[in-house]
C-alpha cells in the first residue's frame, strides 16, 4: 500500500490557529470535566435527595406564622446590632430582660454569634419574619449534610449515612428547631462537624488541629453549655 500523500491528509484544526491554542482551556479540554458531572451526581445521589427533601420540609411556609415569644426577644436583640454594632438589651425605646440590664446595657446573657448571624440576614433581606428565620433554616440544610458527612467518615457506609441523615431530616423536633429564629439549630450542625474533625486524630496521617479548633471556638461562642458537654465526652473517650 502506498503512503498517503500529505496533500490528501485532512487537518482537524485550521492552520490559522496560533501555536498556543493547544495550551489553552479549549472545548476538548473542558469536555472530560463536563463528562464527570453524571458520575458525580450518581455517586452523591443519596445526599442530593436528602438536601432537596430537607429543603422542602424546612422552607415550606417558613414565614407563615409570626415570631413566637423567644424568637421575638432574640430577634429584637439582633436588631440592636444594626443600630449599635453590638447586642444590647434596649434600642432606646423597648427593653428585653430589664433585670439583666447591666454593663451599660450590653447584652451578656448569651454568646453573640447567633445574633450577629441573624442581624446579617436582617440587614440584607430586611426586618421581617422570613429573614429572621432564614439563617437557621439554612443551617438546618447544612446539618443534614453534616450528619451525613460525619457518619460516612466514621462508618464508610453510604447506606448508614443516608439513614442517619434521613432520621434527622424527618425529626419533628429538629425541623421545629431549624424553623425557629433562635440559636438552637446551630449546635445541631456544629456537633457532627466537631466529631468529624475529632476522629481524624486517630488517622495515620499527620493531624491538622485547625478545623477542630475553629469549630470549637464557633461552638463555644454559640452555646457554651452544649459545647462543654461535648468536650467532656470527647475527653472521656480519649
Labelled PLM ranges:
Residues 102, 164, 177, 208-224:
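Membrane-interface alpha helices of multi-pass inner-membrane proteins
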Residues 134-155, 193:
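Transmembrane-helix motifs of polytopic, lipid-linked glycan transferases
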Residues 179-184:
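Short acidic/glycine- and proline-prone juxtamembrane loop motifs at membrane-interface regions
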